[in-house]
A protein has these predicted regions:
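Soluble metallo-hydrolase cores and metallopeptidase-like ectodomains found primarily
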Residues: 49-134, 146-153, 157-159, 180
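Extracellular/luminal Protease-associated
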Residues: 1-61, 132, 230
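A fold-wide structural signal in alpha/beta-hydrolase
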Residues: 1, 22, 144, 159-161, ...
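Metal-dependent peptidase/peptidase-like ectodomains
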Residues: 53-61, 68-70, 78-79, 155-156, ...
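Short, conserved micro-motifs enriched in small and acidic residues
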Residues: 130-142, 169
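Solvent-exposed loop/turn segments at secondary-structure junctions
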Residues: 7-10, 29-33, 77-78, 96-99, ...
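Non-catalytic positions within long, well-ordered alpha-helices that form the structural scaffold/packing
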Residues: 17-20, 152, 245
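Second-shell loop/turn segments in exported
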Residues: 3-7, 12-13, 66-71, 93-95, ...
Length: 262
């Protein structure tokens, strides 16, 4: 059994399996936590069953001959295990395996003279166990809703879709489902603007662009013209904009960094 001082994701899981580990313990929390001995954690691992492979265009096939169990414990418990030199640990687990259905919500406003071209404004509405989700990401969902109200009253030239994605925190599942269902109209998509994290009074605004560097230049120019303090980064972004970029659609995530995420 291996104790790992990091979240166990795909690459680490592969190393553990290949090394012959029979299980793993990952560590969460901080020695500064007071009155806390539990920290909610959920990490997505490959869903492949033993002997199966999942192949997707542009993505690495993952195959495991066996599966190993793992558990996340608090930092303080990890220190106790190490200092006491524990060689055996009894772990009791009570859990229920459930399946849930997530949904996307789409509002479409037809354009006027360029209705055949589509712009998408998106935000995910799900959250994680660590917090109620006001910052991540009901703040973004609220911004998209207000923009939808505005453009409903002021018709845009291009068709606009306002999309609230579910299951983003589970691996961009909502946006991937949208792309799959709307595959035949993706050629009409011109740009995706995603909002993920907003509303921090003290912080910095970042536009994370996954697309041509010229998009960064245009956004920087526009922000300067209207007096918005904003930096741009040209990179892959860990949010639903990445799903659109994967299909060749220029995309960005508007992000307001601040203290803490949840």
């Amino acid at each position: 059994i291996v104790m790992v001082n990091d979240p166990v994701r795909k690459d680490m899981y592969r190393k553990l399996v290949n090394a012959g580990a029979v299980g793993f313990i990952s560590i969460a929390g901080s020695p500064l936590d007071e009155g806390v001995d539990l920290v909610p954690r959920a990490y997505a691992l490959p869903k492949n069953l033993p002997g199966e492979e999942k192949k997707e265009a542009g993505r690495e096939a993952v195959n495991y001959d066996n599966r190993i169990p793992g558990v996340s414990i608090h930092y303080k418990d990890a220190i106790e295990l190490v200092t006491k030199g524990a060689s055996q640990v009894c772990l009791s687990v009570e859990q229920e395996i459930v399946t849930r259905t997530s949904r996307n919500v789409v509002a479409r406003i037809e354009g006027t003279d360029k209705a055949e071209e589509i712009l998408t404004l998106t935000a995910h509405y799900d959250s994680v166990p660590e917090g109620p989700g006001a910052y991540d990401n009901m703040s973004g969902a609220a911004i998209i809703m207000e923009l939808c109200r505005y453009f409903h009253a002021h018709r845009p030239r291009r068709t606009m879709e306002f999309i609230w994605f579910g299951a983003e925190e589970k691996g961009l599942l909502g946006s991937q489902n949208y792309i799959k269902i709307h595959e035949n109209e993706l050629s009409a998509h011109r740009f995706n603007m995603n909002v993920d994290l907003a509303g921090q009074l003290v912080g910095g605004t970042v536009a994370g662009v996954t697309g041509d560097a010229s998009v960064c230049s245009i956004l920087t120019y526009m922000a300067h013209e209207i007096g918005i303090g904003m930096s741009t980064k040209n990179q892959i972004w860990g949010s639903d904009s990445n799903t659109f970029a994967w299909k060749g659609i220029p995309a960005m995530t508007l992000n307001r960094d601040g203290f803490g995420m949840h």
